[in-house]
Regions:
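Mixed-charge, glycine-accented linear interaction segment located at domain edges/termini
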Residues: 126-188
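Oligomerization/assembly interface segments of phage tail-like spikes and tubes
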Residues: 64-84, 139-152
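Beta-strand elements of well-folded, non-transmembrane domains
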Residues: 80-84, 106-112, 125-129, 149-154
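N-terminal interaction modules that seed assembly of large macromolecular complexes
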Residues: 45-73
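Short acidic (Asp/Glu) patches
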Residues: 56-62, 87, 123-134
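Short, acidic/charged, Gly/Pro-enriched secondary-structure junctions
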Residues: 91-121
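Polar/acidic, low-complexity leader/linker segments enriched in S/T/G and N/D
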Residues: 2-53, 181-188
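Catalytic micro-motifs at enzyme active sites that drive phosphoryl/nucleotidyl and oxygen chemistry
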Residues: 64, 90-92, 109, 130-137
């Protein structure tokens, strides 16, 4: 149900149901290097907000005050089959908070029409953890990489949906930079 507001009241009208897009294929790029056939799974950042409850005098309930991104809002986990290549190991303890460029690409297919959507998430950050897991003779094993990102850009079918740049104080949602006035107010 889609809602619109008229004279202070919310009016609901039915919206045609669409089945979810299912992941068709995915790939991960690390500093331009493709991990096709090697990457097994990707857990993209959750984009969580840090909210604090506030209840002032005369308020019958509390409201959530938005304090920006949660500390783990831009955390990424990705799993590779086998032992990672030297290029990935060389990024361990990278000196810059945004020194590792990553790119996730995925294709999602709708079940009703068969239409395919291209999804791209561009991220920059530094690796926090390399988890080699358990290794057994005769098995390929996996390595899980945890990356703390400072930059995140979500694009769906060529349209930028979200861009977050922690270092440069940018937060664009559907083309609107929600921090532009704050940057202006502090002289940036």
């Amino acid at each position: 149900v889609k809602s619109t507001q008229k004279r202070g009241f919310v009016v609901s009208r039915p919206v045609a149901w669409k089945p979810p897009g299912l992941t068709g294929y995915l790939n991960m790029f690390n500093d331009g290097l493709s991990y096709m056939g090697v990457v097994e799974s990707v857990t993209l950042p959750k984009l969580t907000r840090k909210l604090e409850k506030y209840r002032g005098g005369g308020m019958p309930g509390s409201v959530s005050i938005d304090l920006g991104l949660d500390d783990d809002a831009l955390s990424l986990e990705w799993t590779l089959g086998g032992l990672p290549d030297i290029e990935l190991w060389a990024q361990y303890a990278s000196p810059g908070a945004d020194s590792v460029p990553l790119r996730f690409t995925g294709s999602y297919q709708r079940d009703d029409t068969g239409a395919i959507s291209a999804v791209e998430v561009v991220m920059r950050g530094r690796h926090k953890e390399y988890d080699g897991g358990e290794n057994k003779q005769g098995e390929s094993g996996t390595t899980k990489i945890s990356t703390e990102c400072t930059y995140y850009q979500l694009t769906i079918d060529g349209k930028e949906v979200i861009e977050i740049d922690v270092i440069n104080m940018v937060m664009k949602v559907d083309g609107v930079d929600r921090l532009a006035e704050h940057r202006k107010a502090i002289g940036l």
